[in-house]
Amino acid sequence: MTFAAIPLLQRSLPETFSDWLSPLLSDRYDPHLVPGNQKRGLLIGMGMTEKQGGSDVLSNTTRAEKSAEGFYHLIGHKWFFSVPQSDAHLVLAQAPAGLSCFFVPRLLPDGQRNGVHLERLKDKLGNRANASSEVEFFNACGWLVGEEGDGVRQILKMGGLTRFDCALGSHALMRRAYSVALYHALQRQAFGKNLVDQPIMRQVLGQMALRLEGQTAFLFRL
């Protein structure tokens, strides 16, 4: 998600966090719990989904109230909060002019923790190593990205690239699985022949290769 957020944040990162751009572009992972401008690399997550609406984000109830200092206070929840260990999240919340996108850091510029409370991690099926959580916002500080009421269009700039990253990840797993299967078939013998020389196994490997090449072509079209 971090790389998917970079094009949006390069154009629309709130001025308060302009010194985050350098670590945002880094390929380093920095686990330290310090403000983003003090890190060698950053993680960026996303918070859209709420329990009452699911994928219908227009029904979100998390609200954002503008403060005298120019940032917003977020009050509400997210049912799925992607990459909860991130240094900041892009979060959808209802502002006076409609659903808007906010940059919500884990730590405030002065180093204090933001009002983002992780409730629990999701017990997911599949990609368990990529954590998701439930979260509550208690007057969490968020900075507007773009304009009020333009939240869906803004966050989908990140969402579209995130889906492309997911497709690349799936393709990588397919290619790895095919490589392992082919290597095994080249080494393993049964009934006096290597498996790769057995007609049925050749058919299975051929089908795997065709599916893999089809997805490769599809990714290049994307």
List the predicted regions and their residue ranges.
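Buried hydrophobic positions in well-ordered alpha/beta secondary-structure cores of metabolic enzymes
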Residues: A5, M46, A64, L74-G76, ...
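Short Pro/Gly-enriched beta-strand edge/turn motifs at strand-loop
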Residues: L42-M48, H73-I75, G115-R120
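A glycine-rich, basic-preceded beta-loop-alpha segment at the flavin cofactor/substrate interface
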Residues: D110-Q112, E119, A131-T162, S179-V196
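Internal helix-loop-helix
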Residues: M1-H32, F81-P84, L212, T216
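A short core secondary-structure module
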Residues: F71-G115
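Internal maturation/activation junctions in enzymes
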Residues: L13-T62, K66, G70
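Short Gly/Pro-enriched turn/cap motifs at secondary-structure boundaries
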Residues: Q52-S55, F80-S82, Q94, K124-N130
